[in-house]
């Protein structure tokens, strides 16, 4: 078990994971609540905060590797006009291909295991209109569509093959 996760869960029982992305400032607890609006404007302790915090989609399952949603979805803010470093600002570094090659992994620590995700796509979409990719447990056909859309929308070829047998992590900002 991850001691940092246990400590964060002691402070706030809504803490379900830790996310770490080497090469970035992203190394933080992940919250989850019964709706996606709760942590939109709250910090990782649950205190009201305009900047919010990193949180998992309320429908995502995060029990263990076998039971984790096939599309684990985390949300975090990006504030480019402020001096704020608590969200997903550094994800924009992945717009540079070399950065993605040098930092290809994202780690998610759960209560009983550490998951490793390899970056296969980085792309920008309109979250209001392009909601297809925000499905935690799509059937195989819908999941294949998500994978196809992610690969087609990416300007780079990371050389990572992803199939419907895999689990993916979607970071939305």
Residue locations for each model-derived region?
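Solvent-exposed, non-transmembrane regions of membrane-associated and secreted proteins
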Residues: 1-173
């Amino acid at each position: 078990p991850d001691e940092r996760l246990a400590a964060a869960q002691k402070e706030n029982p809504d803490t379900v994971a830790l996310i770490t992305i080497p090469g970035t400032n992203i190394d933080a607890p992940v919250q989850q609540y019964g709706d996606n609006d709760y942590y939109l404007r709250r910090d990782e302790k649950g205190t009201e905060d305009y900047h919010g915090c990193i949180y998992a989609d309320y429908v995502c399952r995060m029990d263990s590797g076998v039971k984790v949603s096939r599309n684990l979805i985390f949300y975090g803010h990006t504030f480019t006009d402020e001096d704020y470093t608590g969200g997903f600002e550094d994800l924009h570094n992945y717009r540079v291909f070399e950065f993605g090659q040098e930092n290809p992994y994202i780690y998610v620590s759960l209560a009983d295991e550490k998951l490793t995700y390899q970056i296969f796509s980085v792309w920008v979409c309109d979250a209001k209109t392009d909601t297809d990719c925000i499905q935690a447990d799509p059937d195989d056909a819908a999941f294949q569509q998500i994978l196809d859309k992610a690969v087609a929308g990416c300007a780079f070829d990371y050389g990572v093959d992803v199939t419907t047998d895999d689990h993916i992590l979607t970071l939305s900002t």
